[in-house]
Structures are given as C-alpha cells and as structure tokens.
Regions:
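Short inter-helical turns and helix N-cap capping residues of alpha-solenoid HEAT/ARM repeat scaffolds
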Residues: 549-550, 580-584
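Sec-exported extracytoplasmic/periplasmic mature domains
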Residues: 22-27, 44, 68-76, 247, ...
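Substrate-gating cap/lid alpha-helix
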Residues: 2-35
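Beta-propeller domains with acidic blade repeats across secreted/periplasmic ectodomains
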Residues: 159-547, 552-563
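Residue-level detector of extended alpha-helical repeat arrays and alpha-solenoid scaffolds
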Residues: 553-554, 584-588
Length: 592
C-alpha cells in the first residue's frame, strides 16, 4: 500500500501557520479563506475516500468538494447550479486547453530559448499567432454562453490566420518512403539472424511512429505511438495512443490490436504499474489506470507536475524499474524542471536521472551526470548496474547513477545516435552473445548493433562487436527494442522519411506520421524460449522466477510480486528467502 509521511506533525505545523495567517488577515480587515479546517472537516466526514493524490495535491473529487470553500458565497457571487453552468464550464475548459498549448508549450527552447534562431523563427511565429487568436475566439464563446446567447456546437476558427497545411521542404537528407516489404528487402542481415515483420501500419493503421515498447506479464506487446511529433498544429487535437498488440496464434506476427489509451500528447516513455501504466505527458508524469480489467484506461491521475518541456524529445522517458522498487526515468538538455512534491521541490537543469517511489511519492534526483542531449536508451543488468545513453555523441555509459564512475563507448564517428539498449539474457541466443548488449542506432547507420561491456577494475571496457542488421534506408529509424517472453528481439521502427526535429519545418510536406513497424529478430538455428507464466502464477511460482536465467523473466516476475499486498506476499517471501542456499554462487543475485 501507499506510505506517505506521517501527517500528524505536519498538520500541527500547518494549523499554526493557518491560525496566524487568519489572525493577521482579520486584524487588517482582509478576507481569509480557511482551507485547512475546511479540508480537515471533509476528510473526517468521509475517511474512506481519497481526496488527495499524495496528501497535498487534490484529486478531481477533492476539488469538487472543496470548491465551495475556495469560492465562498461571502466573497463571490453564488454560481447558478443548472445546465448553464455546465455549458460555461465546457467552454472554459476548451479555452484553457488552447491557451495552455500557447503558454506552457512544448519545444519552448525553440521558441524562447537559444535555438529560437534559426529554427524557431521559421517554425513558430504564425503557429503562435493562430493559437492566441483561437484562444480569443473561445473566450468570446464563454461570454456569449454566460449571457444566455446561443452558439454553434463547433468552434469557428475561420477568422484566425490561415496557414498552409503543408509547405515544400528545402532541406535535404530525407529518404523515400517504402512499404514494409520494400524496406525489409533492403535489409543487410548478418548470417545467423532472421528478421521478420511483427506488425506495421498496413495491418494496424493506428501503429504510427512507435516510440516505446514493453511486454506485459501476459506476453502482449504494448506500444506508445507519437504521430503528433514534433508539435501538435493549432486546431488539430493530438491523438497519440498506447496500443496493445497480441500474437494469439503464436506465428510470430501480431493479429490483434487493443487501444489502451488515446488522445495523448507525446507519450515519450511508459512503464507498467498496478493495473495501469506510468506515462510521460510533459510537463507531467501521469498514471493511466484500467479499473475494470478491459485493457482500456478509464482513469487518469497526474502524479507529478512541473517537468521540463523545452524540447519534446528530451522530456522524461527511458522508464525502467530498478531492483529496489524505484522507477527510473531520464531527462535531457535544455530542460528546466521544478516539481512540487510532498517532500519539497525537486529542481534540475539540462539533465537528470530521476527515481520515483510510487508507495511514498518520493522523487529523487539520482544523477545529473552526464550532461548532454539525446539520452535514448536505458537498461539495468542483473547486478543492478545502469547502462544508459548520454552526451551529445551518444556514447553509452555504465555505472550506478549516484556515482561518478562512468565508462564511455568510443566510436570512430562521434556523431552517432543510439536509441534503446537491451542486455542479452536468453538461451535462445548463442552462448557467445550472453551478457552482450543489443543497441539501436539511427544516424550514420540505421539498424541494430551488438556491444560488449567488460568489467575492468572499477569501470568497463567497451567493444562494438558488429551488426545484427542494417536497413540501408534512412527512413528506418529504430527507436526502442526489447526481448520478448520467448527470447526474440523486438525492434520499434519509427519509420519517417524525415530524420530530424526542428531542422525541418513543422509542416514540411515530407513528414510522414502515418507509418510504423515492429520488427522481430531471432536466431535461425536455436529454439525459442518457453515463455514464463506470469499472469495466473501463484506467489511461490513468481518467487521461483526470481531464480530464472532470463533477466526479463525476473524483471516481469518482480513487477507481479510488487503488485501483491503485503499480507499475501510477505509470508511466502519469508519462506522463500529462508529456503535459499547461501553457498550457491547466485545467492546474492537471488536476494536482489
């Protein structure tokens, strides 16, 4: 269960502040709203309902209940409690959403910051002007509704500045778009490997610009799509999605699609939690919950607010659970983060690795090293060592985030872009590959590489061992990868003729948000692994999976165990730990 700080001492301090503020306000004849006592009264009336997320930030129901205290009739004219008020509220929310896109915009470093020139001056002036005009249109609708006037059901933005839907592209470097079959035909595949298409936009039109993938305990592949990248255009609602793809007949191809969540905006990363997923929704960390078990999100909770949004592809992402139960996530250059937590503000500039504990809502900055951009790829090995991408040349680094002990991967060409990393821990792959690392690269090489990190004293030696496959097509942009429950490697292919962020116009006619592929890589002459039973497994079966050879089996079993209640887990865990043999060489690993 959730464990937040003891509220008794804190409430005593708040009451002292509240009473003093009230006394000073009354002595000066200043109106005072006593939210402390109002909230205490509410909580005592209904102790079974959570009116806050974490003890200080209200839920939607909490705002509804406390609204009369926040806006008392003694200070404000009473609001009508009828259908008119709901109509006004609808229009206000529409206006607020539009204005939010203007004042808390993503990619603000390209609008107000150092990259305003040369990119922002081309991309944003008309877009920003149109957003303000759209806000004004919606503001006028609010006043008309308040006066009792009839308004059209649809907002009319015809009076706002006209912007061509697309513009001709001038910058070079793009590639022609190919069908999945045409793309695969150009792959150069190293002997021994086999690459097949698992899913594409042809079978699943919603599979557009996949950016992050993750397998759940049932063996289903979850995919975050991001066709709104790099920036939603004024008047076009973002509709990024979280998809669930299934291979129900076990033929190596997806044949079923479920939309877990839609109407998202730039879900750069996600990770599983209890009955839902944690999702990046800059400037927020959001939890999307499935409360009725139908594999569709029906509840959204903003857990943390205030993460940077200055560059949309550097926002919080690379979500991965550490062995200690913390959710790690990475943020990059240009960003300024100020998150209010129940333990005080957490601030960071330009780069950070965060660790979030969902039980206590504690957010910690685990590391500010290394500074740099494009940190796409994060993996933790069986001993809890962190391998992540960082620095402008996208060298991989391995250490504990809290330490300064960092090893760099040295390339002949420093302008590489790694994107996604996965330790090889599956008996489906040859013995000589065990412990090595699969890694995507999408610039100066499009495909999957193999790296070797070998311990050397207190740091690591790095070798690039070769390639799995090379696309020979710059529109192939591998952005994430993960070993599936059967040991196959799944690769998310963003697939876009335009490889770049703001270097190309937002409305460049060559941008293509309609495509996306998932590739499945196997070794020809070795059997696949037998998928571990996670869903429906007993506590004892899950605990035994902590001894499994495969990192991913242990990872997924650990998540299932964390979701159990203490009453269910603790007795079985105590018995299991007692049964371990301290003489076993893997004894420390089993305890992790």
């Amino acid at each position: 269960g959730n464990v937040v700080p003891d509220t008794k001492e804190r409430n005593h301090l708040i009451s002292l502040y509240s009473n003093t503020m009230q006394s000073v306000a009354l002595s000066h004849g200043i109106p005072f709203i006593d939210l402390y006592n109002a909230s205490q009264k509410l909580y005592q009336q209904d102790k079974d309902t959570s009116y806050t997320i974490n003890g200080i930030h209200l839920t939607a129901e909490g705002y509804v209940k406390l609204a009369p205290s926040i806006l008392p009739d003694s200070l404000f004219a009473p609001l009508p409690k009828n259908a008119l008020l709901e109509k006004i509220r609808h229009e206000v929310l529409e206006k607020n959403d539009t204005f939010f896109d203007w004042y808390r915009t993503v990619n603000s470093f390209y609008i107000h910051g150092d990259r305003r020139n040369p990119y922002g001056t081309v991309n944003f002036p008309l877009e920003r002007k149109k957003l303000l005009q759209m806000t004004s249109v919606r503001d006028h609708r609010i006043w008309k509704v308040a006066r009792g006037e009839k308004i059209p059901a649809e907002v009319d933005d015809s009076s706002t500045v006209k912007i061509p839907s697309t513009i001709p592209g001038k910058r070079g470097g793009t590639s022609p778009a190919l069908t999945p079959a045409q793309e695969k035909a150009k792959f150069e595949i190293t002997e021994g490997y086999q690459v097949e298409l698992f899913a594409s936009e042809e079978e699943f039109p919603e599979l557009r610009n996949p950016v992050s993938i993750n397998f759940d305990g049932a063996g289903r592949l979850w995919v975050a799509t991001m066709p709104s990248y790099p920036h939603a255009l004024p008047g076009i609602k973002a509709n990024d999605k979280i998809l669930i793809l299934e291979d129900t007949d076990q033929d190596g191809k997806a044949d079923k699609r479920t939309i877990f969540a839609k109407n998202l905006y730039l879900p750069l990363g996600f990770e599983f939690g209890k009955n839902g997923i944690y999702v990046s929704q800059e400037p927020n960390l959001v939890f999307l919950e499935d409360t009725d078990g139908d594999s569709k999100a029906d509840k959204e909770t903003i857990l943390l607010h205030g993460f940077g949004s200055e560059d949309c592809h550097h926002a919080i992402h690379n979500f991965v659970w550490g062995p200690g139960g913390g959710l790690y996530m990475q943020e990059s250059v240009f960003h300024n983060t100020q998150v209010e937590t129940i333990y005080g503000p957490r601030r960071s500039k330009d780069n950070a690795i965060y660790r979030f504990d969902p039980r206590t809502h504690r957010l910690e900055i685990a590391s500010r090293l290394p500074p740099g951009g494009n940190p796409w790829g994060y993996a933790i090995n069986q001993w809890g060592e962190h391998l992540y991408v960082g620095r402008h040349n996208n060298a991989s680094l391995i250490n504990q985030p809290e330490s300064g002990n960092v090893a760099n991967a040295n390339y002949g060409n420093r302008d590489n872009r790694n994107c996604g990393q996965e330790f090889i821990s599956s008996r489906h792959w040859p013995d000589e590959l065990q412990g090595k690392v699969f890694s995507n690269q999408y610039k100066n090489f499009q495909g999957v590489l193999i790296h070797d990190w070998t311990e050397k004293g207190t740091t690591y030696d790095h070798k690039r061992l070769g390639k799995v496959f090379e696309a020979q097509n710059k529109a192939c942009i591998p952005v994430d990868l993960q070993l599936g429950p059967e040991g196959a490697l799944y690769v998310a292919d963003w697939y876009n003729p335009v490889l770049g962020h703001m270097q190309y116009s937002l409305r460049d006619e060559r941008r293509d948000s309609s495509k996306g592929r998932i590739w499945r890589v196997t070794w020809k002459d070795r059997p696949l692994d037998k998928p571990a039973k996670i869903v429906g497994a007993t506590v004892e079966e899950l605990l035994d999976l902590l001894k499994a050879y495969e990192d991913r089996n242990r990872y997924r079993a650990r998540r299932a165990l964390w979701n159990l209640s203490d009453e269910t887990l603790q007795p079985a865990l105590n018995r299991w730990v007692s049964s371990l043999d301290p003489a076993n060489l893997n004894y420390p690993l089993h305890l992790m």
